[in-house]
């Protein structure tokens, strides 16, 4: 006979846990084929515009035969195109982002406020949310007469940036509880991107504590040289931080003092307006 402990163990073994979003699913409800197909799509990125069968297999952990079948299926469905050697994403993939941006509340209500900030200052603003290792741009504005040769990061919707090296990402991490912060660091070791990037866990946790205490984050050249940024939290229901509002600018155009003295109050006021709407 099974003991209660054995029965509990069996039940636990049938539950899958997603360490990134904390979701759970029963094993019998999990469709491995969909998971593998999405793993193929996830293998593409801003630094990987094309994949061959070998690269796809290495990125996903599949066999070459399995990777080939999934690539060919996605090509058949219209999400990939191939030149005979490499596979590329097609515009059809944008239907998912379009559906999200058209239906999600935060991007829609943020956009006019971001546009107003740009009209007032001719600087670039965005709203970002945390997704695992990265912060994702879900709304943004761009100065109409931006002429700087430096092209700061985070200028297009859907752009994904390492959370530990950006002002918005650090805001989002700062408002996680201590356990969640430690879990994040355990799962995503701090990678050096420039000589200014934080790579020591103790120093980084201390920084997150300071950011939460002051309620805003300034970041300079931690992700990209010649670029600095400022971010504040956006609160949703139950006083929970749901996103970050930030400004990104070339260091040759604005100073740290200007951002903190003149732009920070505008960010804080806009974040308050968004909180009232949300």
Curated annotation (Swiss-Prot):
It comes from the Bacteria. Residues 31-91 form the HTH iclR-type domain. PROSITE patterns: HTH_ICLR, ICLR_ED. Gene3D superfamilies: 3.30.450.40, Winged helix-like DNA-binding domain superfamily/Winged helix DNA-binding domain. One of its GO terms (molecular function) is DNA-binding transcription factor activity. The keyword Transcription regulation applies. Induction: By protocatechuate. Transmembrane segments: none annotated. GO terms for biological process: 3,4-dihydroxybenzoate metabolic process; catabolic process; negative regulation of DNA-templated transcription; positive regulation of DNA-templated transcription. Keywords: Activator, Aromatic hydrocarbons catabolism, DNA-binding, Transcription, Transcription regulation. InterPro entries: GAF-like_dom_sf, HTH_MetabolicPath_Reg, PcaR_PcaU, Tscrpt_reg_IclR_C, Tscrpt_reg_IclR_N, WH-like_DNA-bd_sf, WH_DNA-bd_sf. The keyword Transcription applies. Residues 106-278 form the IclR-ED domain. Residues 53-72 bind DNA. Activates transcription of the pca operon. This is Pca operon regulatory protein. It comes from Acinetobacter baylyi (strain ATCC 33305 / BD413 / ADP1). The lineage of its organism: Bacteria, Pseudomonadati, Pseudomonadota, Gammaproteobacteria, Moraxellales.
């Amino acid at each position: 006979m099974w003991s209660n402990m054995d029965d509990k163990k069996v039940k636990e073994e049938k539950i899958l846990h997603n360490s990134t979003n904390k979701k759970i699913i029963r094993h019998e409800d999990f469709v491995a084929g969909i998971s593998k197909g999405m793993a193929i799509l996830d293998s593409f990125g801003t630094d990987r515009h094309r994949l061959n069968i070998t690269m796809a297999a290495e990125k996903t952990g599949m066999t070459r035969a399995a990777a080939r079948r999934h690539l060919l299926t996605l090509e058949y469905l219209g999400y990939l195109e191939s030149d005979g050697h490499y596979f590329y994403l097609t515009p059809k993939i944008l239907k998912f982002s379009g559906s999200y941006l058209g239906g999600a509340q935060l991007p829609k209500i943020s956009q006019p406020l971001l546009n107003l900030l740009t009209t007032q200052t001719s600087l670039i603003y965005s709203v970002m949310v945390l997704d695992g290792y990265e912060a994702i741009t879900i709304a943004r504005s761009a100065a109409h007469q931006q002429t700087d040769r430096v092209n700061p990061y985070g200028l297009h919707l859907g752009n994904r940036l390492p959370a530990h090296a950006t002002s918005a990402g650090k805001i989002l991490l700062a408002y996680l509880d201590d356990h969640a912060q430690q879990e994040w660091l355990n799962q995503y070791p701090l990678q050096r991107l420039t000589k200014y990037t934080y790579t020591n866990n103790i120093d980084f946790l201390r920084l997150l504590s300071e950011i939460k205490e002051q309620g805003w984050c300034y970041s300079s050249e931690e992700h990209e040289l010649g670029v600095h940024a400022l971010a504040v939290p956006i609160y949703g229901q139950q006083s929970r931080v749901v996103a970050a509002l930030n400004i990104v600018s070339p260091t040759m155009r604005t100073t740290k003092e200007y951002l903190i003295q003149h732009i920070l109050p505008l960010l804080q006021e806009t974040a308050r307006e968004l909180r009232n709407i949300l």
